[in-house]
Amino acid sequence: MTAEFIIRLILAAIACGAIGMERQMRGKGAGLRTHVLIGMGSALFMIVSKYGFADVLSLDHVGLDPSRIAAQVVTGVGFIGAGNILVRNQNIVGLTTAADIWVTAAIGMVIGSGMYELGIYGSVMTLLVLEVFHQLTFRLMNKNYHLQLTLVNGNTVSMLDWFKQQKIKTDLVSLQENEDHEVVAIDIQLHATTSIEDLLRLLKGMAGVKGVSIS
């Protein structure tokens, strides 16, 4: 029986670790180790809850609810998830990580109870949701524009650095240098909540910018 429990722990570590690896690759605070530990811990609690009191439950005068320990895992993991939810620049961040921690605990519990296939399917579906919906949201929430900037000579590098500081993705298409100015063609990617009109207005008011056009 012990060997079977060890197998459950290993499967929980693998299934939950895959989710943690995806989170870590995206630079999230809760990464591989956190998810592996949550998955293994949930599996252990489930094993104890299901099998740990077999000798006591066989006694006539003892009545226990073996599901109580497992139920507390759901409550306990909520505190871990809540620690990942932050307010940054008036935006709430960490909700997805908090949700996948909650799901990770559920996967660990499922595998700990012996439902291997359900746990693996749950892990695969979680990875699909995290990856597919990330790509889908990225495509729907971002717009591409082509800008042509006329700058005072020597300002191209500082302008590209400014875009980077604003977290605006840029691709340099061409750079044409003249005697008193340089013409830079770039492709930019803006979040849907950022107004291109506001960006153009801001660029036109910057020192070293002689002209801006969009196509």
Curated annotation (Swiss-Prot):
Its main location: membrane. This is Putative magnesium transporter YhiD. One of its GO terms (cellular component) is plasma membrane. Signal peptide: none annotated. Belongs to the MgtC/SapB family. It is found in: Cell inner membrane. It comes from the Bacteria. Disruption phenotype: Deletion of yhiD in addition to mgtA and corA leads to Mg(2+) auxotrophy. It comes from Escherichia coli (strain K12). Keywords: Cell inner membrane, Cell membrane, Magnesium, Membrane, Transmembrane, Transmembrane helix, Transport. Could be involved in magnesium uptake. It holds the Pfam family MgtC. It is a multi-pass membrane protein. PANTHER family: MAGNESIUM TRANSPORTER YHID-RELATED (PTHR33778:SF1), PROTEIN MGTC (PTHR33778). InterPro entries: MgtC/SapB/SrpB/YhiD_fam, MgtC_SapB_SrpB_YhiD_N. The chain crosses the membrane at residues 1-21, 36-56, 67-87, 92-112, 118-138.
